[in-house]
Amino acid sequence: MANRVPHGKAPIGAGRGKMDFKVLNRLMKQVFSDYPVHLTIVLICIVLSALIGVAPAAYIETITRYIEEGLTSGWAAILPKLTKALFTMAALYLVSLILTTIYTQLMAHVTQGFLHKTRVRMFSTMQRLPISYFDQTPRGDIMSRFTNDTDSLRQVVSQSLPNLLSCGLTVLGVLCMMVYYSLPLMLVVILGIVCMTLATKNIGGKSAKYFVRQQNSLGKAEGFIEEMMNGQKVVKVFCHEEAAKQDFDRLNDQLFRDAREANRFANIFMPIMGNIGNLLYVLTAFAGGLLITSNGLIPNLSIQNLVTLGTIAAPLSISAVASYLGMCKQFTANVSQVSQQMNAVAMAVAGAGRIFDLLDQKPESDEGTVTLTRCREENGTIVPCAERTGKWAWQHQKDDGTMEYRLLQGDVRFFDVDFGYVPDKTVLHNVSLYAKPGQKLAFVGATGAGKTTITNLINRFYDIADGKIRYDGININHIKKADLRHSLGIVLQDVNLFTGTVMENIRSGKL
């Protein structure tokens, strides 16, 4: 069974329940570096689509004014203008639809390509990690990074980030339009912005915090399940069923609590934001009605008046109020959309943090210079060769540039070796032994005595804390790990078959 992370210690990559903006920034940079051309086109389409999406609000004011004029002075002169305005607004919506279709299709390609590259990077990194990493990290937790965490990236890259940018630009454009039409009504909108900000900070912030915790709890639970599945026979042999169930219940309960809190806050968040938007709509309509019915007692201050009439104060028209109410709806809808996407972003940041944690792990170091080569003997001298001779030699380059060769014989010696899987707990003390070429040696002892540990040290799966291990008189730290392991034959206690033919499993790595 794999070694589990001790109770009370967070696994590698665990977050603290807060969204890390450094991780988000790194994620965005990584996506852009992988697909700079695609994302440049996407950004252009989003900006144009957002700006065009704001324009119809202005046309609503124009169309409403034309209808008012048609009702009072007749339709003969107004109908051509009204028709032109309607067709222009329809054309704007059509262009916005085309731009949206283009960038969503591009983002689908970018998302799947980015996930593909991320999985490749993770797997390549995993192949270069030392054995100690897999001892400290449950395999199920690593698998969760390949599945759940990458899936959270899919949603945020394909939907959340484009929506955040689009909605953010739309909100900015709508606010500018609101300032243009009426400064007094803008004060009502500012009140709504304050309420929405408080709701986002208090409710949305808590939801995001628990979504991050949910992602980490899910990784822990899956790691434990995978460990129990692989070690079920050991659990049965040692009658560990009840203890395993208690451990699982603890992890499952924690996952339940985190998921419950995350979804509880997320589920009440959108209704609250929606009702704040509805209340803002009513207050805006009420304030607009007061400005219209005040007969100039309450002046409407606007940039529009300054541009069209030369004065900043003028009565508010019904058409302006109608346009303003449409912008109000558009504003609240986009603010709610931005707030809703933050939960998905929080989950993705938690997943991205765990993925980057894996990618940032220090690969297994190898400072060896001695390599293994095929050889033959000529007049008592070892000579390297390319053909198969059944003989191998250690090849070492001296300081003067000449090559020294030493025949591979299999002489292994330990000199006062100390070792511990963790620095503060030594499991081998002053071990000295030798195995001469051709000699058969057996390590006999109870489980945990260190038999497998000694073979792991010979292969340099772990580095010793003190002492020396020499192989044919060469310090194994000076031998390249690939060549060292190539010279050794290992038969594992547990049989592990990879997907493929029997021959491929026998050859394993020499295909």
Describe every region a protein language model picked out.
Residues 25, 44, 99, 103, ...:
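Hydrophobic alpha-helical transmembrane segments of ABC transporter permease domains
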Residues 1-53, 68-88, 103-107, 111, ...:
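Membrane-integrated ABC transporters
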Residues 70-71, 177-191, 265-353, 358-359, ...:
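Helix-loop-helix
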Residues 13-17, 44, 52-68, 92-139, ...:
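Juxtamembrane helix-loop junctions of ABC transporter transmembrane domains
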Residues 75, 375-511:
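ABC-type nucleotide-binding domain
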Residues 40, 44, 83, 87, ...:
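Internal alpha-helical transmembrane segments of multi-pass membrane proteins, especially GPCRs
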Residues 39-99, 179-184, 286, 293-318:
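Transmembrane helix-loop-helix hairpins at lipid-water interfaces of multipass membrane proteins
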Residues 33-36, 131-132, 148-157, 161, ...:
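An intracellular "coupling" helix at the cytosolic face of ABC transporter transmembrane type-1 domains
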